A protein has these predicted regions:
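N-terminal Lys/Arg-rich, disordered targeting/topogenic segments
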Residues: 1-14
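Hydrophobic membrane-insertion alpha-helices, especially the h-region
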Residues: 17-34
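Bacterial extracytoplasmic/cell-wall-associated proteins, especially those involved in peptidoglycan
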Residues: 127-131, 144-329
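Signal peptide-directed extracytoplasmic domains
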Residues: 27, 36-187
């Protein structure tokens, strides 16, 4: 009887040892498996949907993933949706699975330079974030501020470098860009004017956008602004080429034919006053030039051979400067 009890106890111990050995071997095997290097793309796309859908999507992207990984993910948790940054080079399989669940969403940077138009910036956004320009334009028009019930076509998005997550839709991208930009507009207006009034502020942005397009450098900006104010005060048409560099014409040379045929409010040769919308994005310096313009009696300016402008108070002086300019070009 005693021998039988001893044998039973021995069998239980042996069974337990076998079980523990098996668990240990399984543990070591999993550790070894999780340490195997894989070479995923720098950015992988995790779709919305079931874990099975995620699994097959990763396989389609060339990720070395199998049924065991699917089982491990079921135990670890649901991967994040979106574009996941996996970094550069090799990753251990375990690190890859953890990044699927906990890693930061991948970002890309995009820059709007002062003077550029929304037309071209939208194309850059489209190429960078793989979005349709039509969707981006529709999103902009639904979010952007309005003047007299009409969307402000340009000059709203602040020129800057933006770091935006991949995988966001057009509405979210525009919501971020316009939201951040409007905070800057309001803050700057309150800093320089002591208050923010949308209509008054964006009239200054319209002025600044022409200054931005016309000035050869930052130093000229207050002088260009003074010419604009002086001509407006006298009821003179602005007659500025830069106002015609709107939207898709941002980089187009303004010709006599263009001045003759363009019938939009941007044509300050045909229409007195300011255009209804900013011509493009504006820098801090251009806005400052409009808020704090230089006091001059200048009414004219012309580009000289050194690419800078010669300013004059009378048409007679202006003609002399034009002759000097023509003789050197």
């Amino acid at each position: 009887m005693t021998t039988k009890r001893v044998n039973t106890a021995t069998n239980k111990i042996m069974t337990l040892n076998t079980f523990l050995d098996t668990c240990f071997l399984l543990f070591i095997s999993i550790l070894f498996y999780l340490s195997i290097p894989i070479y995923p793309n720098k950015v992988v796309v995790v779709p919305q949907g079931s874990l099975k859908k995620v699994f097959f999507s990763l396989k389609d992207q060339g990720v070395d993933i199998n049924a065991l990984d699917l089982l491990l993910l079921r135990l670890m948790g649901m991967p994040k949706k979106g574009y996941i940054d996996m970094g550069d080079g090799a990753l251990r399989k375990g690190d890859f699975l953890v990044r699927l669940i906990k890693a930061k969403v991948a970002y890309k940077s995009v820059t709007l330079i002062p003077g550029e138009t929304r037309y071209f910036f939208t194309q850059i956004l489209s190429e960078t974030y793989q979005l349709e320009t039509s969707d981006l334009n529709q999103a902009y028009e639904s979010i952007a501020p309005r003047l007299n019930s009409a969307v402000i076509e340009d000059g709203v998005i602040w020129p800057d470098t933006y770091h935006l997550p991949l995988g966001e839709d057009a509405f979210k991208i525009m919501q971020t860009l316009i939201g951040q930009s409007m905070k800057k507009h309001e803050a700057l207006s309150k800093q320089w004017l002591g208050y923010y009034h949308k209509e008054e502020w964006f009239e200054k942005i319209i002025l600044a956008s022409i200054v931005q397009k016309e000035a050869a450098n930052i130093e000229e900006m207050p002088l260009i602004a003074s010419v604009i104010f002086n001509r407006l005060k006298k009821g003179m048409p602005l007659q500025m080429d830069g106002a015609l560099n709107y939207q898709e014409f941002s980089h187009a040379k303004v010709t006599k034919e263009r001045i003759k045929t363009d019938n939009t409010p941007y044509n300050t040769y045909k229409f007195k006053g300011l255009p209804k919308n900013p011509v493009g994005s504006v820098s801090l310096e251009a806005i400052r030039a409009v808020v704090f313009p230089k006091k001059t009696n200048f009414l004219y300016f012309v580009k000289m051979p050194d690419k800078k402008h010669a300013f004059s108070a009378t048409y007679k002086e202006h003609l002399k400067n034009i002759n000097l300019s023509n003789n050197h070009f």
